[in-house]
Amino acid sequence: MPKMKSHRGACKRFKVTASGKIKRERMNGSHNLEKKNRKRSRRLHQSTLLEGTKAKQIKQMIQG
C-alpha cells in the first residue's frame, strides 16, 4: 500500500508546536483594517491554538 500523503493546504495553514499543539493564524487581519479598532486588529495579528476534535483532524491531515 502506498504512503499516505499529507494535506498540502493544511500544512501551509497550520504549524505543530514543540509540545504537539496546533497553531493557526486568525482570519480578518490582513486588509480593511481601517474600519476595525486598534484592539481588534492587534488581537487579529496574534496566532491562536486549536483545541479538541478539530486539532485531532488537522494533526492527521498534516502527518498524512
UniProtKB/Swiss-Prot annotation:
It comes from the Bacteria. Keywords: Ribonucleoprotein, Ribosomal protein. It holds the Pfam family Ribosomal_L35p. GO terms for biological process: translation. It comes from Chlorobium chlorochromatii (strain CaD3). Signal peptide: none annotated. This is Large ribosomal subunit protein bL35. Belongs to the bacterial ribosomal protein bL35 family. The keyword Amino-acid biosynthesis does not apply. One of its GO terms (cellular component) is cytosolic large ribosomal subunit. GO terms for molecular function: structural constituent of ribosome.
